[in-house]
Amino acid sequence: RPRAALCTAALIAAPSLVNLLVVIEPLLRRKLGAWTLACGVALPAWCLGWLAKTALTDPGILPRLARDGRTSSMRGKTRETTVATTGRTTTTRWNDTCGYFQPPRAHHCSVCNDCVEKFDHHCPWTGTTIGKRNYRAFLMFTYGTTALCAFTMTTCGYSVSYRGLKKSGAAIAVFFVAFVAFVF
């Protein structure tokens, strides 16, 4: 699992570093250079921080119950039960793997093999399941990477228009990487 988050961190850090050293550095002599430099440092740091928070925070994994024979006693019986929560009636499902009826909005992650509260999805970029406890961090990571991609494409586009195509090979390459990341 940590390998996915490390690969994502490298995919954020490498183009950001090239953007800082090759694209933004020549722009420092321009009027907006200091602000561009500040954003060029702050946005990747923001993304990497929220990536780490997302990947390292427990998504809301529900502990498994000890095997006491109850699982085998559920065979052939009703696999769902109705539960009243906050004035609403909800149907919960029996989970053979974890040995209990899942709480409302909890689902079993097939990749991690755990039940997760308010399961959203298993994210291949962070290498973890997104659930109740790391959903906010994941959203902040997503917003940050979107802003970083837009910022990188803007600085690269400005660099190409300012310096010309012949002197902007690295800017074009970084723009392409940021564009693919933005679309993906």
Set out the residue ranges of the language-model regions.
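Intracellular leaflet-associated regions of eukaryotic membrane-associated proteins
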Residues: 1-184
